[in-house]
Structures are given as structure tokens and as C-alpha cells.
Design a protein with these regions (language model features):
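Catalytic cores of nucleic-acid ligases and guanylyltransferases
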Residues: 1-171
Length: 171
């Protein structure tokens, strides 16, 4: 799920693209964000559930979808059985500084500086090398990923708009 993480001290929100708070569905991720992300930060990214399937680590869309459930007991059970991760790809604010009008290259550099990663919160890989991107595109299909994303390095962040190109596998 696409999600924006809002952290201000102990307060953590996981906002969906539509503005719905997803935090109650991913309690293990809320705790990880408190441990692994800076005190005051807003990061755009995705919530994923990686699982070992047929000897390979893949992203499990079905396990992720099951997490949106009204029963707290089921959410807790699934949080233990199929723990989620947050994969950040864009920094919006840090320690009160707004980066949304900065070019993507600058936001990315700052994200790498402030989000050191951990067990549950990681940063997407990027490349500006065409051969590497083509290799990833081929390899990622077997990992359950739709494809790759291309962004302009000089683009500013546009809320509620897709300022990227999705290159998807043919289905």
C-alpha cells in the first residue's frame, strides 16, 4: 500500500493515498517507525509484506490485503504472523523543514542522510544506469513487484499527483 509516514515524537500516523489512517492495521510498523525513523519526519513510501514463497522472498499482496480487518485480535495475530515493512522513497519534511519544493535528487539525498534504515523501515534502491534498471525490471518480476518507477531528478513533490512513470510488466 502506498503510505505516507508522519512521525512527531511518539505520535505516528500512516496515511493512505486517500487520507485514511492505516496505523491500527500495522501496529508492529508503528513501533518500528518509533525505533527506526527520526523524531520529526514525513516520508512517502509503501507498506509491504515480504514472505518466503517457493524458496524466494516475494512481496505478498494477499497477506498485505488481509491486514485491513475490523477485528483488533485478527490484526494483532497477522502482525505477528506476517509482519510488514515500510519502504521509503521520498522525504517530505524533516525536523520542521519542508523539502517538497526541493528537486527529487535533493530530497533523495536528504532521505539517505536521515533515514538510516533498520529491520522494518528501509529505503528503496535507485539507479541512473539504464542497464541496472533493465536488470532490476527483469529480476523484480519474480519477486512479486509490478515493475520499476522512473522519476525526474529535478521534479518537485506534488501532493495527490503522480510525478513519475511506472514501467510495468505485461500481464
Amino acid at each position: 500500500f502506498r503510505a505516507i509516514v508522519f512521525r512527531d515524537g511518539d505520535e505516528v500516523r500512516l496515511g493512505s493515498r486517500g487520507g485514511k489512517d492505516l496505523a491500527r492495521y500495522f501496529p508492529e510498523l508503528v513501533e518500528a517507525i518509533r525505533r527506526e525513523l527520526p523524531e520529526r519526519v514525513v516520508v512517502d513510501g509503501e507498506i509491504v509484506v515480504p514472505r518466503e514463497i517457493d524458496g524466494r522472498t516475494r512481496l505478498d499482496w494477499d497477506a498485505l490485503s488481509e491486514r485491513i480487518h475490523p477485528a483488533d485480535s485478527r490484526v494483532q495475530m497477522l502482525a505477528e504472523k506476517t509482519p510488514s515493512m515500510f519502504v521509503g522513497f521520498d522525504l517530505l519534511t524533516h525536523s520542521g523543514t519542508d523539502f517538497m519544493n526541493e528537486p527529487f535528487a535533493a530530497r533523495r539525498a536528504k532521505l539517505l542522510e536521515v533515514m538510516v534504515g533498520g529491520d522494518r523501515c528501509q529505503i528503496t534502491s535507485t539507479t541512473d544506469d539504464t542497464a541496472t534498471a533493465q536488470d532490476w525490471f527483469q529480476r523484480f518480476e519474480g519477486a512479486g513487484l509490478d515493475g520499476v518507477i522512473a522519476k525526474k531528478l529535478d521534479s518537485v513533490y506534488l501532493p495527490n499527483k503522480r510525478e513519475m512513470v511506472k514501467i510495468k510488466h505485461a500481464r
